[in-house]
Amino acid sequence: MGNKLFVLDLGEIRVDENFIIANSTFVTPQKPTVSSRLIDIPVSAYLIQCTDATVLYDTGCHPECMGTNGRWPAQSQLNAPYIGASECNLPERLRQLGLSPDDISTVVLSHLHNDHAGCVEYFGKSRLIAHEDEFATAVRYFATGDHSSPYIVKDIEAWLATPRNWDLVGRDERERELAPGVNLLNFGTGHASGMLGLAVRLEKQPGFLLVSDACYTATNYGPPARRAGVLHDTIGYDRTVSHIRQYAESRSLTVLFGHDREQFASLIKSTDGFYE
C-alpha cells in the first residue's frame, strides 16, 4: 500500500498583497496615489496516510481565533482576518475523513505562526515536530506577553498547559525519514526562525514537496524569485528558495506553496479525493 496525500482546505486569510509579494504596489512621482490590493489567500494542511503512520503537515488557525473573545489580538484580526465556515476548521476536516486528532501519529509544524499552528492543542497524543529555533521564538513571545507578532500568546498558552510529545529539529539536522517515502526537510531560517518542509513520494506520480511559507506562491518562486513581504531573514529566505528548487527538480517533485490561490484552487481537496 502506497502513500495517500489529502489536501485540507482550512479557509482563507484576507491580506494586503504586499504581505505576499514584496513591493507589489508602490507609489512613484508619476503615480503618487496607487492603492494597495486586498487578496484572500488559502489556509491549508496536508494529511499523509502511510502504511504504518498518519502524518499531518500544519494545523491551520484555531476555530476561535476571531471575534471579541477570539484568540488573536484585535490588531491581528483587523490586519489579516480569518475567513472560514465551521466545516473548514481542522478537527472538522479530520472528522470528514473518519479521523480524530488522536489518530494522527505525527504532526509536522512548518513553523509556529497563527495560521499554521493554531490547532496544536488538539494533538495531545501525537508527536509534534518543530524546529528548535522556531519553538524558542514562539515561547519567548509567550513568556514576554508580546502580542505584536504572528505567534499567538493564547495558542501557545494552551500548548504549554499540558505535557506534549515535542520533537525539536536541531539546526544541523538537514533531512529525516518519517516513513517510507515521507521525508522531513529542515529549511532553516527565512520566513520565520525555523522552517520545515515535507517531501512526499507517491506510487502513481512522483509526488510533492510541501514548503508552506518558505515560499508563498509561484510568483515568489520564479524564476526570477521574488521576496515575500513578511520575512525574518532575507538571506535565509533566498537560500531556502534556491534549495527548494534544486531539491524538487532533482527528484521531479511538484512544489506545493504556502498560500498560492491559483495553485490551491487546482488541487483535489480532501472532500473530493486524494493523491496516491
UniProtKB/Swiss-Prot annotation:
InterPro entries in the cross-refs: MBL_superfamily_lactonases, Metallo-B-lactamas, RibonucZ/Hydroxyglut_hydro
Membrane: present as a keyword of the record? no
Task: State where Zn(2+) 1 binds.
Answer: 111, 113, 191, 213
Q: What is the top EC class of this enzyme, as a single word?
A: hydrolase
Per UniProt, the keywords (alphabetical) are: Hydrolase, Metal-binding, Plasmid, Zinc
Q: Which reaction does it catalyse?
A: an N-acyl-L-homoserine lactone + H2O = an N-acyl-L-homoserine + H(+)
Cofactors that this protein relies on: Zn(2+)
Listed EC numbers: 3.1.1.81
Residues bound to Zn(2+) 2 are 116, 213, 259
The entry assigns this protein to a family as follows:
Belongs to the metallo-beta-lactamase superfamily.
What is this protein's name? Answer: N-acyl homoserine lactonase AiiB
Q: Native species of this protein?
A: Agrobacterium fabrum (strain C58 / ATCC 33970) (Agrobacterium tumefaciens (strain C58))
